[in-house]
Amino acid sequence: SMQPYGNRNKRRKAKNFSPFVLFLQPVIRQLVLHMKKSLIALAFGTLALGMSEFVMMGILPDIARSLGVSIPEAGHLISAYALGVCFGAPLTVLVARTRPLKQILLALTALIAVGNLCASLAPNYWMLMAMRFVSGLPHGAFFGVGSIVAERVADAGKRTEAVSIMIVGMTVANLFGVPLGTYISNVLSWRTTFAIVAVWGVVALTLVRMWVPRMEPLPDTGLKGQFRFLRSLAPWLVLASVMLGNGGIFCCYSYVSPLMIHTSGFTEENLTLIIMLAGFGMFAGNILSLIHISEPTR
């Protein structure tokens, strides 16, 4: 029988999109089956952290120009955040290991908001560096505590998927949040970008308060017990792979804006698209890991 041209055209368009739909299908299925309000709150938290960490990459030239420092000096603001990450996780273990998990998450999300709000108001380079350090303090601790919470609220046999859903917020930040922050910095000011990250931190704080259930603290095994797992080789191998992988990414990504502008010849107006393409690569990598996350590793 004769098919109307319009119907054939619609089916052809749908067929063209089928590889993309198949690519996202496992992720969509996991979100539909396992998405809970508490996981949404955690994903909003990692989204705020992703913007807080990576937004510097797109606005680095604007900050250097505004504060009257060189690009390498402005790059130290990225290092200050990383230093805060290194100090924040063990500091949380020392100070809050006996506190309820929800209280810890509330304190960490509040610190995201406060750190970025103060960064938006920083009067000079050194104050901004201090606030970048403060903004980095909750990063590692939030992922650690958030992973425990995600595992506790997950359905039986779906703990890994629950943690992956929480981390989706970070990849969404790279895909949409960081390019948006770059665009806002170009149009308005880098201070406005940090203020928006602070607002997102407040949103995450509100959702954690409303949707994350109260949970008892982890059993207190003492300070030595917290690091007993480091006696075996496997954690050191994981730490080494993460360190090398992230080190390689940051060596390139930290200075993507000046490299694209001064070396490759792109304009500042192109930065938003470039940052978005980099974010899409991270997003695609997370999707691929989610697709294969339940498969045996050996």
Q: Predicted regions span which residues?
A:
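Helix-breaking motifs and short loop linkers at transmembrane-helix boundaries and internal kinks
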Residues: G68, P100, L121-W126, G265
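Conserved MFS/SLC helix-loop-helix module at the cytosolic interface between two early adjacent transmembrane helices
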Residues: F87-P123
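Paired small-residue
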Residues: G115, W126-V134
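Helix-loop-helix hairpin linking two adjacent transmembrane segments in secondary transporters
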Residues: A156, I165-R209
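Juxtamembrane intracellular "pre-TM" segments in multi-pass secondary transporters
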Residues: V212-V238
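Residue-level detector of conserved catalytic or cofactor/ligand-binding positions
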Residues: L288-T297
